[in-house]
């Protein structure tokens, strides 16, 4: 199984997969050379995704791909499924779930600008805004803050307030917030403290949905695992990567190595 993202947000998906399928072997591709995907063009996102799958598929016998990134999923998943003959799973902003939960009919959606601007997201926003007010924050800064938090950098309250200022000033805030990026679940506590010190809020990420899809597929398809190691690949060697190595120990990767995607 190949799981890939431009950062470590996708490790939250891997963590959940390990809980339900502890014997699965996996490759995690950290495309940190392209971090964050959210500020890239659709053309770049599509071509980069094709390059990642094609390159790794030539080296390792992968039989399932998990795109652990809302941006790539909303922009490129349909193209990737046509391009490759293996099952590819993606993760999407789960507005349908938010509609079932919201009580004040005000739903918040936080995602990267590329995710917000994708035709997929625009379509579902239009579909569900008929019966709900959907407040949107498109930002590429939040994923960067989450990555820094994992490396031990304190989260800046000032930066968070600047990002969420459009909601802070609302007379009524969303009571349900969709986390449209796998990084954002790392900042739930900080976001709640900024917006809802005395009120409750329900956060929705789409991890549970994609995990259910992956679990259902793997349990019914008898996938033959030819990879017998857990491998961590990265596209750029830098100081940020070195700071992540201690964090990665919990995932028990047996191989950590660079891969050239250029």
Curated annotation (Swiss-Prot):
GO terms of molecular function: glutamate racemase activity
Keyword flag Ligase: no
Claim: Isomerase is one of the keywords in the record: yes
Gene Ontology biological process terms, A to Z: cell wall organization; peptidoglycan biosynthetic process; regulation of cell shape
Keywords per UniProt: Cell shape, Cell wall biogenesis/degradation, Isomerase, Peptidoglycan synthesis
E.C. number: 5.1.1.3
Family statement drawn from the similarity comment of this UniProt entry: Belongs to the aspartate/glutamate racemases family.
Function: Provides the (R)-glutamate required for cell wall biosynthesis.
PANTHER family linked to this entry: GLUTAMATE RACEMASE (PTHR21198:SF2)
NCBIfam families hit by this protein: glut_race
Protein name: Glutamate racemase
């Amino acid at each position: 199984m190949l799981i890939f993202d431009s950062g470590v947000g996708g490790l939250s998906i891997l963590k959940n997969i390990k809980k339900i399928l502890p014997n699965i072997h996996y490759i995690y591709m950290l495309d940190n050379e392209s971090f964050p995907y959210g500020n890239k063009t659709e053309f770049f996102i599509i071509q980069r995704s094709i390059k990642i799958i094609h390159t790794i598929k030539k080296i390792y016998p992968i039989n399932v791909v998990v795109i652990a990134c809302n941006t790539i999923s909303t922009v490129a998943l349909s193209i990737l499924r046509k391009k490759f003959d293996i099952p590819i799973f993606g993760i999407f902003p789960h507005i349908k779930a938010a509609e079932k939960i919201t009580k004040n009919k005000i739903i918040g959606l936080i995602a990267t600008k590329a995710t917000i601007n994708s035709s997929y997201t625009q379509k579902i926003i239009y579909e569900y805004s008929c019966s709900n007010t959907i407040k949107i924050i498109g930002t590429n800064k939040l994923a960067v803050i989450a990555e820094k938090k994992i490396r031990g950098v304190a989260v800046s309250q000032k930066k968070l307030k600047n990002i969420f200022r459009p909601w802070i000033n609302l007379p009524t805030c969303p009571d349900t917030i969709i986390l449209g990026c796998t990084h954002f679940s790392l900042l739930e506590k900080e976001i709640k403290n900024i917006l809802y010190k005395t009120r409750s809020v329900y956060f929705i990420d789409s991890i549970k949905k994609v995990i259910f899809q992956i679990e259902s597929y793997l349990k019914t398809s008898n996938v033959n695992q030819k990879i017998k190691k857990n491998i961590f690949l990265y596209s750029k060697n830098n100081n940020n990567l070195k700071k992540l190595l201690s964090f990665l120990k919990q995932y028990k990767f047996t191989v950590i190595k660079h891969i050239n995607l250029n």
